Amino acid sequence: MRPSVITVAVLFVQSTWASFAFGNPMSMRNKAHTNDLVNSKGKPLVGRFLHITDMHPDIYYEKGSTVDHYCHSYDHNSDDTPLGKSKVGYLSPGPGYECDSSPALIDKTLEWLKEHQDDVLGGIDFILWTGDNSRHDNDNHFPRTQSEILASNEDLVNKMIEAFPDVPIVSAIGNNDIYPHNIMEAGPSSMTRQLAGAWDALIPYEERHTFEKGSYYLCDVIPDKLAAISINTLYLSNKNAAVDGCPDDNLDEPGSLFMRWFKIQLEAYRLKGMKVWLLGHIPPTRGQWYEDCYTSFTDLLYEFRDIIVGQLYGHMNINHFVFLEFDKLPVDTESYGIKSAQPKYVKSLIDAQYAELPTFPENLTEEFLNGTVGNYSLATVGGSIIPEMFPTFRVYEYNISDIANQLDDREELTEITSFNWETLEEQSQSDYEIDKKKKKKKKNNKKKKKNKRKNIKPGPLGPAYVPSLFTPISFKQYFLNTSNYMDATKDTEISYELLYTSKDSPYNMPDLTVPEYMRLAKRIATCDKPEDPHQFKLQSGDQNTFRISKKKKPSICPIAYTYLWHAYIGSISDFED
């Protein structure tokens, strides 16, 4: 019997690092000890990082066009030209329309970030960028092409690097970053190779082969201490007709092969004593992922809860969070549409998941934290730059106070090697044959056990659960009120403003651990904290103060209303059924 994939990875200790690897650990370690408190580009750490997503630049956006035509200019002699429709502005059409981002919005946003990343944002250690770097394929008059998509990606990558030259940027592929959208076959392919070329400046040299194979990769953002794994959620998405989920008995499926690769990387990072952020585009919710992909993924989240710091996604354009529970399928929520930005989705999430979370005892016990809270992991979905709502991004603060004290504890860590795709596929195929035989035996056994809990031994609770090194402490949500820039020109200077923070009322979160998010979710669902139901202030300034009419009693309580208002970046204020 041949060893398993994980065993093979460990047996490669003391050999040289192959192409399917983390890179040379000795060179990274030497660099880390030169100046321990720096990111992977040598910049001193400040304890903050940026999450940005769904920029959707549109080269065909044109000032003076109409929203009925997706902000594209048609032939004025065409019968398709609407009469009496309002014209869109230079920067955006304002919130509520299905237009992608104007070149001006992208350029001015990145210019603002470049200019104010230190004085306003307080400095950035690394960036997690969760995809959709091309426009939507929603206008038959302007069909997308593969060359346009690749050019859009390469252009945006170059602009991001220009804005953040000393900040490591890790990006994840979006469903609109490929041609045709949503559909992606197993790699290597022309699409994966050309996308690797467009993203060349982001992908570590030693990860290039991996990316060409599956369009996912990994990258150290703090050398030898903190990494980010970019997930290709297209291989896990049930909207991708070119794949068939993540069956554990068919390694021809790219989703199954990804899960094997993913587990190997987590195992190796654990052995190196490192922590990991996960980022992807399509969030793991019902109706988005294949169920077997969701199940395999949550199994790994549970098993490696000691090293996974958190997960960030995009795609849905609304700020919210969901919980993934080990050994349970995702909750059933109402579908959403980008056209209407349906508040029903988040409201159904509150009812179906938040309300059903376990109630915390007055005195927390280790048993409750390990046995109950530890079954849950948190996925945060970010608001977008695309101006369908107000453009937005989030800056996280995370704990680096103990980083220097923990360096000496890992001096003698074993150097783990990895291996190339040929080795992975060979060993995985062997495991596949073994698994097939085991499953055949089980099928022939008439005695079946019902509801048997999976035999997975999890790690201890890590920084996602217990405040410690790299635990996210708080966040600040910034937004651009495009309604104030309808008359903007190329000379207009824009200003992103602070919308709210995780420490603001009514959230009052001491940190961003899973237990604190569970408490918040329960408060949102049960209206645990009484507030004035007729008036509440979301942020200083008349434009962000909303009053609920006393004549009409709201169907949702103020804390839930505030959460919904923030989810839709202040662009929607009516959440009544």
Curated annotation (Swiss-Prot):
Belongs to the endopolyphosphatase PPN1 family. GO terms for cellular component: cytoplasm; fungal-type vacuole; fungal-type vacuole membrane. Its cofactor is a divalent metal cation. CDD domains: MPP_ASMase. Glycans are attached at N363, N370, N375, N399, N481. Residues 24-577 are vacuolar. GO terms for biological process: energy reserve metabolic process; polyphosphate catabolic process. Catalyzes the hydrolysis of inorganic polyphosphate (polyP) chains of many hundreds of phosphate residues into shorter lengths. Disulfide bonds: none annotated. Its main location: membrane. The chain crosses the membrane at residues 3-23. It catalyses: [phosphate](n+1) + n H2O = (n+1) phosphate + n H(+). It is a single-pass type II membrane protein. Its EC number is 3.6.1.10. It is an enzyme of class 3 (hydrolase). It comes from the Eukaryota. GO terms for molecular function: endopolyphosphatase activity; exopolyphosphatase activity. It comes from Schizosaccharomyces pombe (strain 972 / ATCC 24843) (Fission yeast). Keywords: Glycoprotein, Hydrolase, Membrane, Signal-anchor, Transmembrane, Transmembrane helix, Vacuole. This is Endopolyphosphatase. Residues 1-2 are cytoplasmic. Residues 437-456 have a biased composition (Basic residues). It is found in: Vacuole membrane.
